[in-house]
């Protein structure tokens, strides 16, 4: 596997131990037991992609999620087609300024470089293989406000969780714990940030522009962002749709994004498919 990247970064010493405080480091949330319908913002997101060219959205009915996404050439001829429900996971990523825990300590996500060792929940420190980004300007956010990130205020997920305002793309997955019941034990699960909207201290950030950043490790991992466990990039075909053409080409050349990529935890919501 080869990816073009900058020289390895600052992580050289041994990784700090990862604390597994199951009763304290995960938000306790009553998670749904089955995948939930994808909300309308995903349909409108793909309309935004279509407006930028090379991807076209075809809806069966006006406001319905039924439809497909088509890749097109410069003349508008279709090259491929995929059911809209299958690509509902597009753009799961961090925003610039988010602090990511590495073996050398917390680092802003935009300052991470391939070779930096990222602290993971299950496998200690793992090297960053690739990072990418996608920008949305005021025009895109004005026409499609559902592209704006979800803002999680300090402490709303538990003591010190997150440590400060954390902004994530709506589909970015956060690790939570379903409390034990009489019929089942406690279970760690991912859920999209947008599913937390409406809870106190969680809203849509009123930004006029945003830069989304992606972090690729050897596989899908739970990593620490602002003290909360959330996901690294899961490079499956659905997520690849949300990347820039240059990013898709770079990852495809290294063998990523062509086949389904397993999640490191069960997922509550549309991305469970």
Model-derived regions, located:
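Short, solvent-exposed coil/turn linker segments
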Residues: 108, 127, 192-193, 265-269
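Structural motif
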Residues: 110-117
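Long, positively charged leader/targeting segments at protein N-termini
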Residues: 78-108
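Long beta-strand-rich cores associated with HINT superfamily self-processing modules
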Residues: 95-102, 119-243
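Sequence-level preference for short, compositionally simple segments enriched
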Residues: 2-90, 205-273
